[in-house]
Amino acid sequence: MTTKFTALAVFLLCFMPAAKIEHTQASLLSAKKTKHEEAKWLTHIDRNTNESFPSLSADKDKKIKPIKLSAHTEKKEKDKPDKTNDEKETYTQSEKELLSRLVHAEAKGESYKGKVAVASVVLNRTEKKGFPDTIRGVIYQKNAFEPVANGSINQKPDKESIEAAEEALSSKNRETDAIFFYNPKTASDNWIRSRKIVEKIGRHVFAV
């Protein structure tokens, strides 16, 4: 079989024009050169790719570690103390004086217990929804207390009123749970009279 192909090749070379033979040889050389250059170019691209991204293959199997707080930071967060009752219920001197003046104006002539109860109403309101959360805010809330409207809130409090206010401020157990008080002989508001009465002290009715 090989002998037949060899003979055929010799026959073609003998009868093929010289120009045709040269053209065929040139085409074969050109194709060989093209394949060589292509292989060289691919090798160049592959080398450059590896040099440009050297960490891709090395890092692909690495796992991303979560960020962790330092031991010092974690300890600081865990050791953060909660506020104590004393820290939560701190009052300024200005608030104490204002509460004393309200007690003096609202409970003048009342017993010491009655004065403490009036102060307790103010403090109870600071802890209830619907009221300001400061002593000043509660006392100066619109239409909340008559002494604010008529100016008697500005009178200097007597000693007993100051002591009653201080006892209410320092006591963990309030004299009353009421958030309202009124004098039934002088109160003209029907709404305040509709509130549930919890106790009566002197001339005042205390309600919720």
Curated annotation (Swiss-Prot):
One of its GO terms (molecular function) is hydrolase activity. Induction: Positively regulated by WalR. Expressed mainly during exponential growth and rapidly shut off as cells enter the stationary phase. Gene3D superfamilies: 6.20.240.60, Cell wall hydrolase SleB, domain 1. Residues 71-95 have a biased composition (Basic and acidic residues). It comes from the Bacteria. The keyword tRNA-binding does not apply. Keywords: Signal. Pfam families: Hydrolase_2. Residues 52-95 are annotated as: Disordered. Transmembrane segments: none annotated. Residues 1-26 form the signal peptide. This is Uncharacterized protein YkvT. It comes from Bacillus subtilis (strain 168).
